[in-house]
Amino acid sequence: VSTRAVYSSSPNDYKYTNHDKKINIYDEEKNIIGQYHPKERNRSGSFKDLHLLQEVYYNTLKGDRFGLNAWYINSNRELPMLTTDYGDATDFENRQREQTFRSVLSWDHIKSNWKLGVKGGYIHTWMAYDYKREVAPDNWASMTRSRSKVNTFYGQAEGEYSPTKRWFFTANVSAHQHLVRSEDKNIILQDGGKAIVGYDKGRVELSGSVSAKWQPIDRLGMSVVLREEMYGSEWAPLISAFFIDGIISPKGNVMLKASVSRNYRFPTLNDLYFLPGGNPNLRNEHGFSYDAGVSFEVGKENAYKLSGGANWFDSYIDDWII
């Protein structure tokens, strides 16, 4: 059993020289005769964070381990103004608040050459962003009142199996149910007479993968990964990857490595619907990535060590989601 609590805070109130601004110096005829960087004071970067973590584990001493983990976060942070903003920081409030609770139940079964694990959990996040401006003394106008609630239920199962020292297999399957409501209470859009405030959506996400690693000799290893995903009701094509690495010279521990992988990514709910900036017509991102590299390491024990490497990578992506 383990219980941890962390609390941190800071007013972040300090003076600094703003090198992103320049103030002109004028003569009596309004000619610029010089410039200087102003000294300013940051008054809008305070934060208060509380983190709680509770862990409970039970080991049967027969290869089974059960666990319960729970996290809680309470955060209240001011967001500082840009250093190029010429407004008065005391006239604005830019604040983000968050409360997140995460819980996980787990079971692991471990044997000499295989392992099985199952997890299930729930995540709740409430997040608020407020942007206010003082339009008159003690009279604040709310420009943005963003509120988001995210509820996620998930389950995961994974396994590992090593029949010999030359082969290693893994498998993983997971399921997530996301329920998201995001809104700006200051903005109401109309769509055919129906009020839409941000978005209120849910989506099921499934993912499964298998991998095999083969080490024919001590200095060479190869692995293949196959993955399949489903978002909502749409399945991705089979996503594959191949990796290879080998030591070409034990002297200097010179190693070559390379990989090729297929990329496929569905847009997130924020990519599709978040206001402003969401695009419900986004297409799925897809492409291929390649990389190769070489590394070395030389040295003398308890005296010195020198290591280095060089890498090359290239990607071809269509419908890239930025």
Please give the residue ranges for each predicted region.
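Transmembrane beta-barrel wall of Gram-negative outer-membrane proteins
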Residues: 1-9, 22-76, 99-111, 163-169, ...
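Transmembrane beta-strands of outer-membrane beta-barrel pores
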Residues: 7-11, 72-76, 111, 122-126, ...
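Flexible loop and strand-edge segments within Gram-negative outer membrane beta-barrel domains
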Residues: 10-14, 43-49, 63-116, 122-150
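Outer-membrane beta-barrel translocator domains and adjoining extracellular loop/strand segments
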Residues: 14-20, 70-73, 78-87, 128-138, ...
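Outer-membrane beta-barrel channels and translocator barrels
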Residues: 59-63, 110-114, 162-166, 215-221, ...
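Outer-membrane beta-barrel signature, preferentially recognizing the C-terminal barrel domain
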Residues: 91-110, 234, 248-249, 255, ...
